[in-house]
């Protein structure tokens, strides 16, 4: 029983790390999001600080700020067609935000700051549903803070980047098994909680402008290892038995890797009214070979759990049209490959390949202030899949079914310049 619970605890952290990457929230700027979240070659606001910091030096104004928030409304339905069992996630909203600022020191150097929440989400299933031994609910938040510098080496080429400081927290609850209860019939469950999980990384980028109508961009964001040390694991509603853990708390240490990302793309502006953008993004998911957890209780051995993820790509397309002096319209699309391989599809992160459809606009309130709005409809392809790494009494007990998922993301922001 204790070995089984260790595997379950390990699954908790595997799911948390997936939410920090595999279910990455692409909402780091309303203007970019409205164009399929393509932005590595687009210089139209301080959002460039996140997408390609080397482009900050091309902003025309002395000081530019972009800030906003997006609502994430997701829905997942699961069904076992053999048994007829059905479950659906509870409606909730995530609220990723961003704050970008760029300051032009002179014509050759700009400084910037980017504060974002690219990894943060939540899922809440119905209480004691068929997969409650894998997850009841999860909440994760991670904040990226990036001081940046952009240097123009010539009229056609610039570089940029800086360190990344990350801090976050995670809370996860699951039932201990498919059937275990205490003497009163309450399902035995485990809650894991940790705050202040942190570490550092870096980003580097360049922008090449061969002609004034075309910008080619490259951005690399490093792998970041989030170190959870002394986190709290709470065991609740366990029966009074020598074969099960006692109710109470223990500590744990774990390292949660966030994969590196590489983005390359371009923006083409044939005239003053139109702009077209394309980004290719590669996330290096193969860092998730396994995940190790060391427990504070000396009677509980360290566990190793294989994840076997694969690298995945995202293809982003966007367009912008300046309709009037005050209104700019945008639209886009992206295709997002899932890094999850067969046999590793868990309900903590129920995502398959996804298609994102986006639109939005900017309204110029005054010479200095603009309001930016975007909307994303994200639909994941229906999939029949299973999670095969759950163990009971040393035996694999696959959890399988059909998943249907989608998400709506309306967003609002402002751009201010001096």
Residue ranges, per PLM feature:
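Positively charged n-region of N-terminal signal peptides that target proteins for export
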Residues: 1-4
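Sec/Tat signal peptide C-region and signal peptidase I cleavage site
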Residues: 16-20
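Outer-membrane beta-barrel pore proteins
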Residues: 40-62, 101-105, 153
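Asp/Glu-centered strand-loop micro-motifs enriched in Gly/Pro and often flanked by an aromatic residue
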Residues: 38-40, 44-45, 85-89
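Bacterial N-terminal signal peptides
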Residues: 7-15
């Amino acid at each position: 029983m204790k070995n089984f619970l260790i595997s379950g605890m390990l699954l908790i952290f595997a799911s948390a790390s997936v939410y920090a990457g595999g279910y990455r929230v692409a909402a780091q700027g309303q203007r970019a999001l409205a164009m399929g979240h393509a932005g590595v070659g687009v210089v139209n606001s301080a959002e460039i600080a996140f997408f390609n910091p080397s482009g900050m030096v091309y902003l025309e104004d002395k000081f530019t700020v972009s800030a906003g928030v997006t609502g994430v409304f997701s829905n997942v339905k699961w069904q076992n067609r053999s048994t007829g069992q059905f479950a659906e996630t509870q409606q909730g909203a995530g609220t990723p935000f961003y704050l970008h600022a760029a300051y032009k020191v002179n014509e050759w150097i700009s400084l910037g700051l980017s504060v974002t929440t690219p990894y943060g989400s939540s899922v809440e299933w119905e209480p004691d549903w068929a997969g409650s031994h894998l997850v009841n609910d999860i909440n994760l938040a991670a904040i990226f803070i990036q001081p940046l510098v952009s240097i123009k080496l010539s009229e056609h080429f610039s570089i940029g980047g800086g360190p990344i400081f990350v801090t976050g927290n995670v809370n996860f609850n699951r039932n201990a098994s498919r059937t275990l209860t205490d003497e009163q019939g309450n399902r035995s469950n485990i809650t894991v909680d940790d705050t202040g999980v942190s570490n550092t990384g870096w980003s580097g980028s360049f922008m090449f402008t061969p002609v004034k109508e075309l910008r080619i961009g490259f951005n690399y964001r490093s792998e970041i290892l989030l170190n959870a040390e002394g986190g709290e694991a709470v065991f609740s509603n366990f029966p009074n038995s020598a074969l099960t853990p006692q109710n109470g708390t223990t500590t744990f240490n774990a390292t949660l890797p966030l994969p590196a990302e590489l983005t390359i793309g371009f923006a083409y502006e044939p005239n003053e009214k139109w702009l077209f953008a394309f980004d290719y993004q590669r996330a290096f998911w193969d860092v998730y070979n396994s995940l190790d957890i060391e427990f504070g209780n000396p009677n509980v051995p360290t566990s190793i759990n294989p994840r076997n993820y694969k690298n995945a790509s995202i293809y982003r397309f966007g367009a912008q049209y300046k309709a009037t002096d005050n209104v700019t319209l945008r639209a886009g699309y992206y295709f997002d490959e899932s890094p999850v391989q067969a046999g590793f599809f868990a309900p903590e992160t129920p995502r398959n390949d996804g298609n994102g459809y986006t639109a939005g606009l900017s309204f110029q309130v005054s010479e200095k202030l603009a309001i930016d709005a975007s909307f994303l409809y994200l639909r994941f392809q229906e999939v029949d899949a299973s999670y095969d790494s759950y163990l009971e009494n040393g035996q694999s007990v696959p959890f399988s079914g059909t998943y249907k998922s989608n998400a709506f993301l309306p967003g609002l922001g402002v751009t201010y310049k001096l």
